[in-house]
């Protein structure tokens, strides 16, 4: 399920990120990302919590980077971090505004990255 559901190449799977986020944001029990929330609400010197959050972010970015590499990105790590910023921003905006449309806005911003990736591949 998720990114690997159905047909499509790596770029298509990357594009699936944002509709999946939109589905998550539309759930009644969406309260944002527990990792972002935990860092925001706890002692900034809490290294254990930060380490757990960083490990989660690395896993997410690693999955995105592997798809970016498969798609032929010139700099898969950079693309993963760019998409990660859009993802995290959409999560925070959706949490604050209660508007699942934040995922669509992030998808529109990501589209220029995907178009450049398709042109270079």
Where are these regions (language model features)?
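Amphipathic alpha-helical segments used for helix-helix packing
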Residues: 13, 27-47
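Hydrophobic alpha-helical connector segments
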Residues: 2-29, 70, 76, 80-83
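Short alpha-helical scaffolding segments that buttress acidic/His motifs in well-ordered protein cores
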Residues: 18-21, 35-39, 83, 87-90
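Alpha-helix boundary/capping and short turn/kink residues
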Residues: 7-11, 29-30, 47, 58, ...
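An amphipathic alpha-helix signature
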Residues: 15, 58-61, 65, 107, ...
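Hydrophobic/aromatic-rich alpha-helical bundle segments in the mid-to-C-terminal region
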Residues: 49-55, 69-121
């Amino acid at each position: 399920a998720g990114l690997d559901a159905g047909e499509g190449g790596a770029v298509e799977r990357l594009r699936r990120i944002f509709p999946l986020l939109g589905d998550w944001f539309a759930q009644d029990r969406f309260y944002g990302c527990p990792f972002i929330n935990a860092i925001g609400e706890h002692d900034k010197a809490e290294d254990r919590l930060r380490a757990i959050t960083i490990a989660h972010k690395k896993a997410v970015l690693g999955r995105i980077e592997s798809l970016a590499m498969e798609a032929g990105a010139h700099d898969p790590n950079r693309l993963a971090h760019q998409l990660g910023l859009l993802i995290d921003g959409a999560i925070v905006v959706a949490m604050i505004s209660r508007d699942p449309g934040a995922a669509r806005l992030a998808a529109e911003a990501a589209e220029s990255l995907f178009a450049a990736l398709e042109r270079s591949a």
